[in-house]
A protein has these predicted regions:
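Conserved helix-turn-beta segment of the N-terminal RecA-like "Helicase ATP-binding" lobe
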Residues: 2, 100, 107-133
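Conserved two-lobed SF2 helicase motor
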Residues: 128, 136-151
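SF2 helicase catalytic motif II
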Residues: 144-191
Length: 191
């Protein structure tokens, strides 16, 4: 079921699967059901995710908003180029302390995220899905096409997904890959 509400610029996909409906988390507020049960349970990571960077006040403010109620919440981090979105994303990953997938669409971003994660969260093992590699770790960086091709086997691995260049999500391959991953928290990053 695809819906579009022109007044709110609202676009979503709701699909039916056996005894339940799959609804994007950004659509919960539009539903008129009495109760929504999100009974997914994800283990905390055992990795030592210590962020060594120092955020600027505006970056810290953004991170604090994602953790307003003590746990990470889904949302979009939108900021201009050069603002430090990747750097800030590293702190969000570190603070959340759950298995995380960072989704990117190019090999260049794939390498950049791996390098930044290694700098800002030293000692953490970083998994790679893409560029001929398939290795799931506490933090994994994946290229959309590779994640799309392995979406069935990856669907239950991650509690949080950070989507770099989130404005690409409406494309069918990107939205299929993202929606097939059963993460509790999805954070988009976009300029």
């Amino acid at each position: 079921l695809y819906t579009y509400d022109n007044g709110d610029e609202f676009l979503t996909t709701i699909s039916e699967d056996e005894d339940y409906y799959i609804v994007p988390s950004n659509s919960y507020h539009k539903l008129e059901w009495d109760e929504i049960n999100d009974n997914r349970n994800f283990e905390q990571t055992t990795a030592d995710l210590n962020f060594v960077g120092t955020l600027r006040w505006e970056q810290q403010e953004v991170v604090d908003k994602f953790f307003k109620r003590g746990r990470a919440r889904s949302g979009v981090l939108q900021a201009p180029c050069g603002w430090g979105k990747t750097f800030t994303g590293c702190e969000i990953i570190s603070r959340n302390k759950t298995k995380t997938l960072v989704l990117v669409h190019t090999k260049l971003l794939f390498r950049q995220w791996i390098e930044e994660l290694e700098r800002q969260i030293p000692g953490v093992k970083i998994g790679r899905v893409g560029d001929g590699l398939y290795d799931i770790q506490e933090i994994t960086v994946g290229i959309y096409k590779s994640v799309y091709n392995r979406r069935d086997e990856m669907s239950e691995h991650f509690s949080m997904i950070l989507v770099d260049e989130a404005h690409l999500c409406p494309a069918e391959m990107f939205s299929t890959a993202l929606n097939s991953l059963n993460a509790k928290v999805k954070i988009g990053i976009s300029a």
